[in-house]
């Protein structure tokens, strides 16, 4: 071939390539023509006319990766149902997502950082990566490719309208129906597509349909067959390598993350635990570079907004104690800011049809635990329930007075605590359920019960109801999590801090050792108060009795329907429920701390029997007719529940009862007794009592506890009136049912079954002696026990079906026990 021919052919090929390139670029330009361009983390084109969002992804690398980001999904618009839990602002995700080219498509792949190799060997890291699954959660066609820059244009809309937070599964799992995503009714909200230098934010309306919606959906949705929520997608720039990880330590109340390092030395641990925390650094002059800043939802009304701001600011003292004065602050969210914008750590004020839980959470880097965004959800109806509780205690005439016993002021004090508590979770702090027992409430990360005190003159003192400010434990944990270790290895610096905590007398009790009524740490409980759980229960019972005896018209606001008394009496009648649980932890309980080899911390000890016996006496006091009775004049004020069509809270806050429309005292007593028996007869507690009796002559053991209980409940020699005798019969019958359930229950320890069987036979013998004086009750109890013994496999029955306990906690859910002032985010 001559040079001329070769050169001519080269010109022709080059011209063709240029033409193709120009055509490709023209196609790319044509595809984005007229669309709104948003520059930032990812080049974005918004098509308002067709409700589309297009992404121009960077040129793929040699592995086909066109971008890697932190990905999180939320709901901008929720369902508004606490039992279902599809609330606005609760984050899902926090994974690293990679957009990868595969042929003519781009896939979104969630990387697996739970298993990794930190070794330098590429082959070793690759071996781990290919040993565990990843997750492709979306794919989209490549619309155009920019020949000049290599950028890929993809329609991101179907990613944004996916069921990213698992709405259908959640609705089905909560018994609300089999819902399916309706694609033609799920559209991107192009007016809520935002792109910033380090994050992108997108909203989309997503609709789920069914032909059989459940109760909660019917209550909260205008057309229950079509549930439309607003899904939110966040993409965040991967953090740089400057973040310093911090080791997690189970002796401090931290929120951690875990991964498995397959390249760990053979003599080392493959499981690596890191603490989650914000990046907090100082410049060369020792000043904080980028303070942690939280924002209060501007949708929260005053005076609630001010209380949230004030409580949130308490953490500033903890950061100052950690060596970072000015390292933390709180402001009100500016107008016009999307509450899910990743640039802002937001305390969201969220409404539901019924009262519910609050949460503190975070979006973090799964590689390091670095918190990139704090997210707090506060349920708005909680404050109203708190007011109801305090109106039952103090009287409604105190509302709005501004005095120490003003229910509104008391509820706002609780809101300050709630703000600090949930922000604490977002900062990386876990619960310390032992903090209520020392240093006048050592932490905002405990669950605070109101410290209302009974005076000798029959009045109530509300001046100590809630603490103010951050606690001593919080300052110590702030040093542990955020303080500078000055070049010391984490393990060494943390060991020094643990010694400091021990010298001070700090106590940490974790969620698993506190939350359930059956747990065994004597000072680990929720919604308790006071340094001595037993003395606090005595005080709580006095407060309850004082308020119950004067309960009536003074507990109503002007013009309020008398029906309201039936809901206000519930938290008052059950006012002792959580302090009862706290006191019961001493029965069969232990005192212990979390220990590491060589740290010199003390070994566990069993609670002395004299304290256990006092706890037993107090529990039995809560089951006495005197404790369960209500004055006749109080009962007469409890007007029948009226009809309230459409009120989702109506009825659920009152005692159920076969005696309606009259107030059913026996049903209320059944509910209270159920709580006492839950505490006394928790199977785990019975196992510990039996073991302690076997191990030491100083502890009489389970048999003694059951015998003492039987003697107390079956004591009909006190000359009680007809109502109180009926209450005694009720409680004794409920006790028999519990013993039957324990004796023939499948999951009960054999040693416990033997003891409860003996107690059941003893109860029958006591009933035999009552035949002459109380034939009807005695005969019925004997027959019930005899029938259970004859069948030998009677299904466990905790209490009669009517003995439902009204919700105490926001609503009581799988997250934990029922309580009136609940908040958890670690949860």
Predicted segment positions?
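Bacterial N-terminal signal peptides
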Residues: 10-21
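Zn2+-dependent metallopeptidase catalytic core
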Residues: 62, 301-327
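Soluble non-cytosolic domains of exported or imported proteins
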Residues: 65, 298, 302-310, 409-418, ...
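Bacterial N-terminal signal peptides that target proteins for export
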Residues: 2-12
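The catalytic-center signature of Zn2+-dependent metalloproteases
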Residues: 332-350, 413-468
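Auxiliary tRNA-acceptor-end handling modules of aminoacyl-tRNA synthetases
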Residues: 26-300, 318, 333-385, 390-407, ...
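Conserved catalytic/binding loops enriched for acidic/polar residues
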Residues: 436, 440-827
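Sec-exported extracytoplasmic/periplasmic mature domains
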Residues: 313-324, 424-425, 429, 450, ...
């Amino acid at each position: 071939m001559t040079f001329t021919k070769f050169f001519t052919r080269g010109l022709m090929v080059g011209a063709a390539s240029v033409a193709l390139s120009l055509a490709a670029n023209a196609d790319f330009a044509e595809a984005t023509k007229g669309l709104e361009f948003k520059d930032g983390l990812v080049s974005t084109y918004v098509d308002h006319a067709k409700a589309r969002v297009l992404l121009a992804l960077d040129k793929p690398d040699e592995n086909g990766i066109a971008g890697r980001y932190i990905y999180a999904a939320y709901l901008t618009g929720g369902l508004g149902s606490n039992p279902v839990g599809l609330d606005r602002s609760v984050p899902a995700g926090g994974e690293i997502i990679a957009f990868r080219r595969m042929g003519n498509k781009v896939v979104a792949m969630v990387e697996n950082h739970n298993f990794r190799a930190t070794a330098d060997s590429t082959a070793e890291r690759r071996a781990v990566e290919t040993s565990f699954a990843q997750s492709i959660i979306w794919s989209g066609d490549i619309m155009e490719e920019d020949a000049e820059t290599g950028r890929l244009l993809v329609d991101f809309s179907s990613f944004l309208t996916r069921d990213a937070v698992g709405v259908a599964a959640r609705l089905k799992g909560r018994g609300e129906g089999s819902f399916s995503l309706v694609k033609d009714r799920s559209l991107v909200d192009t007016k809520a597509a935002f792109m910033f230098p380090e994050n992108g934010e997108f909203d989309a309306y997503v609709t789920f349909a069914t032909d059989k919606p459940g109760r909660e959906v019917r209550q909260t949705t205008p057309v229950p067959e079509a549930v439309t929520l607003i899904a939110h997608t966040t993409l965040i720039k991967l953090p740089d390598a400057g973040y310093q990880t911090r080791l997690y330590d189970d002796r401090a109340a931290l929120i951690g993350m875990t991964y498995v390092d397959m390249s760990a030395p053979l003599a080392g641990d493959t499981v690596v635990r890191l603490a989650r925390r914000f990046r907090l650094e100082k410049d060369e002059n020792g000043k904080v570079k980028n303070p942690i800043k939280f924002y209060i939802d501007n949708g929260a009304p005053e005076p609630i907004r001010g209380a949230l701001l004030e409580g949130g600011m308490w953490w500033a003292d903890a950061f100052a104690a950690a060596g970072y004065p000015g390292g933390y602050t709180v402001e009100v969210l500016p107008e016009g800011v999307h509450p899910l914008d990743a640039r802002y750590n937001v305390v969201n004020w969220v409404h539901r049809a019924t009262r519910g839980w609050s949460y503190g959470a975070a979006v973090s880097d799964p590689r390091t635990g670095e918190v990139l965004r704090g997210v707090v959800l506060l349920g708005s109806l909680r404050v109203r329930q708190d007011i109801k509780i305090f109106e039952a205690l103090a009287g409604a005439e105190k509302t709005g007075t501004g005095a120490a016993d003003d229910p509104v002021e008391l509820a706002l004090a609780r809101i300050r605590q709630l703000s600090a508590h949930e922000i604490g979770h977002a900062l990386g702090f876990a619960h310390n359920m032992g903090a209520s027992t020392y240093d006048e409430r050592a932490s905002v990360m405990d669950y605070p019960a109101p410290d209302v005190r009974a005076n000798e003159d029959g009045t109530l003192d509300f001046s100590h109801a809630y603490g103010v400010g951050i606690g001593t434990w919080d300052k110590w944990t702030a040093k542990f999590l955020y303080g500078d270790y000055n070049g010391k290895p984490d393990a060494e610096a943390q060991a020094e801090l643990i010694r400091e905590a021990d010298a001070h007398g700090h106590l940490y009790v974790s969620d698993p050792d506190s939350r359930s009524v059956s747990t065994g740490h004597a000072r680990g409980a929720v919604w308790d108060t006071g340094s001595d759980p037993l003395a606090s229960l005595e005080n709580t019972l006095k407060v309850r009795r004082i308020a119950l005896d004067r309960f009536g018209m003074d507990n109503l606001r002007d013009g309020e329907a008398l029906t309201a008394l039936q809901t206000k009496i519930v938290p008052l009648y059950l006012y002792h429920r959580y302090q009862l649980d706290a006191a019961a932890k001493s029965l069969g309980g232990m005192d212990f701390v979390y220990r590491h080899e060589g740290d010199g911390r003390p070994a566990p000890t069993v609670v002395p029997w004299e304290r256990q016996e006092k706890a037993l006496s107090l529990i039995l006091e809560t089951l006495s007719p005197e404790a369960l009775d209500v004055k006749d004049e109080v009962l007469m004020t409890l007007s029948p529940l009226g009809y309230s069509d459409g009120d989702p809270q109506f009825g659920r806050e009152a005692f159920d009862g076969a005696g309606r429309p009259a107030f059913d005292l026996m049903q209320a007593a059944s509910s209270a007794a159920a709580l006492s028996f839950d505490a006394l007869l928790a199977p785990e507690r019975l196992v510990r009592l039996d073991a302690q009796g076997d191990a030491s002559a100083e502890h009489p053991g389970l048999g003694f506890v059951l015998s003492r209980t039987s003697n107390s409940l079956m004591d009909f020699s006190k000359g009680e009136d007809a109502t109180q005798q009926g209450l005694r019969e009720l409680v004794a019958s409920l006790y028999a049912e519990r013993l039957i359930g324990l004796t023939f229950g499948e999951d009960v320890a054999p040693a416990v079954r033997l003891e409860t069987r003996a107690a059941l036979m003893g109860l029958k013998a006591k009933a035999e002696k009552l035949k002459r004086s109380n034939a009807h009750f005695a005969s019925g109890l004997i027959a019930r026990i005899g029938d259970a013994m004859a069948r030998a496999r009677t299904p466990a029955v905790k209490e009669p079906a009517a003995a439902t306990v009204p919700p105490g906690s926001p609503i009581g859910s799988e997250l934990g026990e029922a309580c009136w002032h609940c908040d958890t985010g670690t949860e």
